[in-house]
């Protein structure tokens, strides 16, 4: 039996660098049954296989038009079915992932880079992009979320529940653990699950972020006293949660002074007007006050991005370029960032960033006065 596996996002997104967990579980399942399994790097290889599994996470990842589900071709993932994506069969869903599925592809990428860079090739720095493939055990301890946010793909469940024991996907030879849980803190068994992670003595992270609104003293004390890997990531999606998030930030700062606290900040969802821009800056100002970093998320509905049709399109771009680069966000106000872009502009007139700022300031001077000159480094904990 020859099984082909296609990670559609790997093929269709040039800079995509994260393993597809479903692909790894399917590979592990079939290898245990003696099948020959291969990660396909071209859709042209489908003909050489008895069965092919194609998984896609992102809705805008392109695939050939002729690819259709059949007895031979099995397709799954949110990229195809959004919130209606069918579950894997239990025997596959709860199988140990094959963490070596991508090994041959990684080695090919290394050899290609060596051939191009020659003596200048630095393998250690080159391999950083593959760290999730090589260093992490990856999986879900819990599944589900009760929030039902309209912008979120996670609509299948209305509660959070234990999904897999850690041992189901934990490889002790790997350096770290990456959790893909939808809303870990929403599970009533969060403390027991956290204790199992701590017991491994391995650094771990929640890639999908954590629900700031559920932070309590006990949760904060538990979270900020572990070997955490990288930034603690939360979400500040709605300005309507401003007072609640403010309260929770105070709790966080009782237990950690770390600046490795980051928030996803959703923009362009409820509207793409001046009020949405103001609401974005209002949230960013609060995060600055508590020395947290933002990551601006411009809303995309499958393949449709409303902000791209907004009169403030250039301002949304500038906002993300400023907010999503910590080295810049920490040192420059929004106005300083726009002025720095203008200083690099080589033709007459204003660059798009400076022009967008000036036009908005002319239209909404009160908002500009309140927020455009705020600087992260001016706030102290």
Predicted features along the sequence, with ranges:
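Residues that mark the start of a beta-strand
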Residues: 1-4, 36, 135, 148, ...
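A short, structured N-terminal alpha-helical element that caps or precedes a catalytic domain
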Residues: 1-84
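Radical SAM enzyme core and accessory elements
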Residues: 2-8, 12, 31-42, 47, ...
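Canonical Radical SAM [4Fe-4S] cluster-binding loop centered on the CxxxCxxC motif
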Residues: 16-22, 131-168
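Anion (oxyanion) recognition and catalysis
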Residues: 31, 198, 285-289
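Core AdoMet radical
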Residues: 53-57, 153-248, 259-269, 293-297
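Conserved C-terminal portion of the radical SAM core fold
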Residues: 60, 177, 227-232, 240-322, ...
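Ser/Thr/Gly-rich flexible loops in soluble cytosolic domains mediating phosphotransfer, phosphorylation
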Residues: 73-116
